Amino acid sequence: MRSLHRTQIKPNTCRKNKITGQKPGSDRKGKNFDERQNVIFDRNWYFYRGDVRNAESPVYNDSAWRKVDLPHDWLIYDTKNLYEDSIGWYRKNFAYAPDKTGNDDRVILRFEGGYMDSSIYVNGEHLGDWKYGYSTFDWDITDALHKGDNEIVLRVVFQAPNSRWYSGAGIYRNVWMIRLPKTHIPLDGIYTSSVETKNGYDLTIDTELEWGTDSGNYE
C-alpha cells in the first residue's frame, strides 16, 4: 500500500514528522525508512549483437557471448555502420540471498540509461518494457527472484534515424541494485515546493511511503 504525507515548514520553525511524531526517517522502533543498500551492478555482463531465440531463458548458453562491463555501447565496434538498425542482448548471473532477519526486503534494479527500447527479463519472466532511451528506469524484481543464482536479461532495440546527434546503443549508463526495507520511501518519492511570503518562504515536503505488510499501525 502506498500513501502520501505532507510536511509544511515555515520560516524559523521545524515540524516533526506527521507520520510518527518523531524525527523524519524513522519509525517507532528506530528503523530508518530511508535505509537502503546501493550496489553498482556494472561488471560481468555478457553481450550479443543480433536477435536470437530464447536468449531470455535462464538455461540459455551464453558462453560464446562477449564479456563486457557497463557502461557499454555496441555501435562503436563498427564505426562504418553507426546508424544501422540492430538488436543487442545483455545477460548477467548473480547470487541472491534474502534478508538475514527473515523479512522480505524489496530489490530494485535502476538503469540510468538503455538506448533505445528495452525489455527486461528475470529468470525467464518478462517484467516489462521501457521505450525512453535517455531516461532512468526502475524495476522491482523482488517477486521474480529466488534464493541462489538468478539471471537478469535485457533486450535492447536500436532503430535509426532517431536522433540529431550520436546516441550510442545499449546499456550506456550505470546499473544499480538497490535493496529497500518493506516499509520505505520509494525512489524519487520526495517532492518539494516553496511559496514566497513576506517573512521568507514556506516549504512543503510531500513524501510517499510504501507500507510493508508488517509495518504496524501508524497514525
State what each model feature region is.
Residues 51, 80, 85-188, 193, ...:
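Accessory beta-strand-rich segments of carbohydrate-active enzymes
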Residues 122, 201-219:
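Beta-strand-rich binding/interaction modules
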Residues 27-28, 46, 129, 211-215:
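Generic detector of bulky aromatic hydrophobic side chains
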Residues 194-201:
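Short, solvent-exposed loop/linker segments at the N-terminal edge
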